[in-house]
Amino acid sequence: MAVAGAMVMSGGVLLLLLAFTCAAYNDAGELPPISRRSFPKGFIFGTSSSSYQFEGAAAKGGRGPSIWDTFTHQYPDKITDKSNGDGACNSYHLYKEDVRIMKEMGMDAYRFSISWSRILPNGSLSGGVNREGINYYNNLINELLSKEVQPFATLFHFDTPQALEDKYKGFLSPNIINDYKDYAEICFKEFGDRVKHWITFNEPWNFCSMGYASGTMAPGRCSSWEKGKCRVGDSGREPYTACHHQLLAHAETVRLYKEKYQFTEEAIRQSPFIRDNNLNRRSAKALQKGRIGIILNSEWFVPFSQSKSSNDAARRVLDFMLGWFMDPLIRGDYPLSMRELVGNRLPEFSKEQSEMVKGAFDFIGLNYYASSYADNDPPSYGHNNSYNTDSHAKITGSRNGIPIGPQAASFWFYIYPEGLRELLLHIKENYGNPTIYITENGVDEINNKTMRLKEALKDDIRIEYYHKHLLALLSAMRDGANVKGYFAWSLLDNFEWSEGYTVRFGINFVDYDNGMKRYPKNSARWFKKFLRK
């Protein structure tokens, strides 16, 4: 699941997009062929997952509850089908089968997330480390490596330990920074000899906007007038506070990893830890030398009209979604538009914090799914403060009754492959062309329980979606975007947060009523052919 980004499109860019769209088809109206060989040597292809959506075994193996366990059980009406991730798709027990599927498809890598409360059941070191959790992830990592699949490990994918939510309100408290860093260090120590790509946080935009502004995702906090009609929360302040603490936790953890575990040549030259502890070059080079980054999600937003107000609105939406995180990571502070419009509700970085956050990544993960239109929407006099209105922009999937692209199963999902290209080029031109991995990209279909299995496996819309987005990605790379890998969402059908099991994102079908049996969809067969070396 992913969300938005925005920038102005001039007439020249529109012509370029039209040319790209037309060039995507040959004279017969077919998409041009594409395969692994179309991409540079060493380009990584994989699939992604997350612990709560995939693992199941929610109360097994010593795992403590997360905020998603609490949210789905206390507020089942906030989930479309009133379901939860207690069983998910049972990857906790079926991980070997899942790795076999990846290997047979020809995938190079697998991005999974580690459940914080499976490692530290009460969220902090004081409650002890759960060795069963350590053993599970060791087994998963070893199984991946035995099948020549690279592990990409995400440390946080929306699932704050409930114990920390109870103790000090989770990411609303700066206390979580040290607890998160302690948890991350356990993972570096236990798995870092084999995991060479680490992600600190997945989609902080989703976590903070949906969890603290709209209240439609855990922990389900918002102002009473917002969509989630929450019992507690402040949609005008809490989203900014939570994400401020995530950025600080990210930066602290990146510094920890670089100084104690990574030891690249640059770190060896610059690190006071190495110098102060008299670590010589030989011992430093023998350590992990992995890479660490963060995953951001963004839509592409097209101005609703050619007016200046529409163009400015599109820029603001981008600032409030992608720039919220990229600006601090590149420039050390939030975008000017956010500082002006949010005012004192937006936390400030100290000089030391600004320097720490700036440049705190080896790569950026980008999750892209869909695009929308953006138009100017100034607030009315005396309006209530909320992140959802602070950008003074209105977002819509249609213009004059015509959608920006075909609508997928989810209400927010308008398919627009060109948006991936434009988003990548925007990052290239505005943020110094960092190393990027596309860490999620995919499309959902309705979970039609009356459909026969044979028909459910015919997901031609998904094949077309991947084909067009890979063409868009290749076009951006040819124009200089620094992309090193692509991960499809997702390997399997799974629990899709507030939509429960009502939609299916998998390239492999999961039969939830028959032992979680996996079946390859047509898109899985397409990927296998695409990935053939």
UniProtKB/Swiss-Prot annotation:
GO BP of this protein: carbohydrate metabolic process
Protein origin, superkingdom: Eukaryota
Recorded GO MF terms: beta-D-fucosidase activity; beta-galactosidase activity; beta-glucosidase activity
Protein biosynthesis listed as a keyword: no
EC primary class: hydrolase
Binding positions (a beta-D-glucoside): Q53, H157, N202, E203, Y369, E440, W489, E496, W497, F505
Family membership noted in the UniProt record: Belongs to the glycosyl hydrolase 1 family.
The name this protein goes by in its record: Beta-glucosidase 10
Organism ancestry: Eukaryota, Viridiplantae, Streptophyta, Embryophyta, Tracheophyta
